[in-house]
Amino acid sequence: EAGEECDCGTPENPCCDAAT
């Protein structure tokens, strides 16, 4: 939910890490 608004295009994205 935290990474829904974030663009998970890069594995180094801190937002993507929180979305997993």
From Swiss-Prot:
A GO MF label: toxin activity
Gene Ontology annotations for the cellular component aspect, listed alphabetically: extracellular region
Disulfide bonds: C6-C15, C8-C16
Distribution of this protein across tissues and organs: Expressed by the venom gland.
Gene3D superfamilies hit by this protein: Disintegrin domain (4.10.70.10)
Statement: the UniProt record of this protein carries the keyword Signal: no
Keyword RNA-binding tagged: no
Note: The disintegrin belongs to the medium disintegrin subfamily.
Its job: Inhibits fibrinogen interaction with platelets. Acts by binding to alpha-IIb/beta-3 (ITGA2B/ITGB3) on the platelet surface and inhibits aggregation induced by ADP, thrombin, platelet-activating factor and collagen.
Record protein name field: Disintegrin
Organism lineage string: Eukaryota, Metazoa, Chordata, Craniata, Vertebrata
